[in-house]
């Protein structure tokens, strides 16, 4: 109906018809937007809760402290002070008081509010971070191994006192006259490339860059099959003679010390006198009538003092022996091997022997593996076979010394009536001898002083 009217009145009213449809299109649009906006900003509640959330944020002004005055701007970066910052000054606290004090001061451009005037320019001079030096561009190295390892390798190679080919040749010839420095061989072994490095070297044909020396070293290494294992064999051979000598000397010292201690009649007499002296002192107590005493009780003699506190029981023992059995004063001469034996740890000796035995097994493994090396290892294989045969004989000799030494050490502990470790027996006896000799020397000096004093008094008596 309205359309007909509109079409009939087209010539009279052309514009009015379009506005009503536009209003209809615009009128429905305004209502929808508000609900979606409210749903996005607020949770389930309608607009009133939104107003509640926005209202609480501003806290009451009285509790909030006034912010500290800003320090003047600096012209450069300064070294930071890594303190734990406080953001609020509690009323009545030191910081509250300082804040109020700062409010009363005038602020100048070159000063920070403080009890004293601080010059910003002076602080900048002293605590400036300074400009960081720009790193110098380093020339690229050949990507054989990582930069750190390459640098360490080059430094160590420069420290070697022998050319690498000569070192490897000496190892292959098992010739200690050309190279007998164990440390140099160990340093070289520590420079060995990984399997990945070795694989890369065998196929590398590019530019060597600044790693010329390193590249030559690695190329030299890959020429010999299992060169690292062969160098370890040579290192073992260099140390072997010294180790065998040390073990033999140590085991002989243990056997000699055990024999000397158990057969020394003077030591037995000393121990008997100490036992008698102790039983006299402990008469009528639970410690009296002893048939023996723990070995470490020997050291207590120097701690037991007489009434005048000038003489110890050790001094008294030496004094009695000097007057009644002076031949016992040098009992320590019977124990010539004691001091060297006291430096030996039987457990360490056993571990060294075990390490040598395991080392020989590795040598045998390399001997077997080198059979397929071809001519390059022919001389090495022959010399290694001879060395293994000789080394096994020497190790058997050491083992023949070790088992009796261990048995003698156990028998020595039984000799003193307790299950002492061998190291404790030797250390205690050695300490006792030193205390005994010191007490005797002090007694001699005291006797000389008393003799001089008596002579002086006699002279004074004559002059009267």
Swiss-Prot record:
<feature type="compositionally biased region" description="Pro residues">
    <location>
        <begin position="14"/>
        <end position="70"/>
    </location>
</feature>
<dbReference type="GO" id="GO:0045010">
    <property type="term" value="P:actin nucleation"/>
</dbReference>
<feature type="region of interest" description="Disordered">
    <location>
        <begin position="1"/>
        <end position="74"/>
    </location>
</feature>
<feature type="domain" description="FH2">
    <location>
        <begin position="68"/>
        <end position="462"/>
    </location>
</feature>
<dbReference type="GO" id="GO:0051016">
    <property type="term" value="P:barbed-end actin filament capping"/>
</dbReference>
<dbReference type="InterPro" id="IPR051144">
    <property type="entry name" value="Formin_homology_domain"/>
</dbReference>
<dbReference type="GO" id="GO:0003779">
    <property type="term" value="F:actin binding"/>
</dbReference>
<dbReference type="InterPro" id="IPR015425">
    <property type="entry name" value="FH2_Formin"/>
</dbReference>
<dbReference type="Pfam" id="PF02181">
    <property type="entry name" value="FH2"/>
</dbReference>
<comment type="similarity">
    <text>Belongs to the formin-like family. Class-II subfamily.</text>
</comment>
<protein>
    <recommendedName>
        <fullName>Formin-like protein 19</fullName>
    </recommendedName>
</protein>
<dbReference type="InterPro" id="IPR042201">
    <property type="entry name" value="FH2_Formin_sf"/>
</dbReference>
């Amino acid at each position: 109906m309205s359309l007909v009217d509109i079409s009939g009145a087209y010539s009279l009213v052309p514009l009015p018809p379009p506005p009503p449809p536009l209003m209809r299109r615009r009128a429905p649009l305004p209502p929808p937007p508000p609900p979606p906006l409210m749903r996005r900003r607020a949770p389930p509640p309608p607009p009133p809760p939104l107003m509640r959330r926005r209202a609480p944020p501003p806290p009451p002004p009285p509790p909030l402290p006034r912010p500290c005055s800003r320090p003047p701007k600096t012209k450069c970066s300064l070294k930071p002070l890594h303190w734990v910052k406080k953001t609020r000054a509690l009323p009545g606290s030191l910081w509250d008081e300082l804040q109020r004090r700062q409010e009363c001061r005038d602020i100048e451009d070159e000063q920070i509010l403080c009890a004293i005037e601080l010059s910003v320019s002076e602080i900048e001079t002293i605590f400036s971070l300074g400009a960081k030096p720009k790193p110098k561009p380093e020339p690229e190295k050949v990507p054989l191994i990582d930069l750190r390892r390459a640098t360490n390798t080059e430094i160590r190679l420069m420290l070697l006192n022998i050319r690498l080919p000569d070192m490897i040749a000496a190892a292959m010839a098992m010739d200690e006259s050309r190279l007998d420095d164990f440390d140099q061989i160990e340093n070289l072994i520590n420079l060995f490339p990984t399997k990945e490095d070795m694989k890369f070297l065998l196929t590398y044909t590019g530019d060597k860059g600044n790693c010329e020396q390193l590249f030559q070293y690695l190329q030299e290494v890959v020429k010999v099959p299992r060169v690292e294992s062969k160098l370890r064999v040579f290192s073992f051979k260099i140390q072997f003679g010294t180790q065998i000598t040390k073990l033999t000397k140590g085991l002989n010292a243990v056997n000699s010390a055990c024999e000397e201690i158990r057969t020394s009649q003077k030591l037995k007499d000393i121990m008997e006198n100490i036992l008698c002296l102790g039983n006299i002192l402990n008469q009528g107590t639970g410690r009296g009538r002893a048939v023996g005493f723990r070995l470490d009780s020997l050291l207590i003699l120097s701690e037991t003092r007489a009434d005048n506190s000038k003489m110890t029981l050790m001094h008294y023992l030496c004094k009695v022996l000097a007057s009644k059995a002076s031949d016992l004063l040098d009992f320590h001469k019977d124990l010539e091997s004691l001091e060297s034996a006291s430096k030996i740890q039987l457990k360490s000796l056993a571990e060294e022997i075990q390490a040598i035995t395991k080392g020989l097994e590795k040598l045998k493994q390399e001997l077997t593996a080198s059979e397929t090396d071809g001519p390059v290892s022919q001389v090495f294989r022959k010399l290694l076979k001879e060395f293994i045969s000789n080394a096994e004989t020497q190790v058997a000799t050491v083992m023949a010394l070790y088992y009796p030494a261990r048995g003698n050490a156990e028998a020595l502990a039984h000799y003193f009536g307790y299950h002492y470790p061998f190291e404790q027996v030797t250390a205690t006896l050695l300490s006792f001898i030193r205390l005994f000799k010191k007490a005797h020397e002090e007694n001699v000096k005291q006797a000389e002083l008393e003799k001089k004093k008596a002579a002086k008094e006699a002279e004074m008596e004559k002059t009267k």
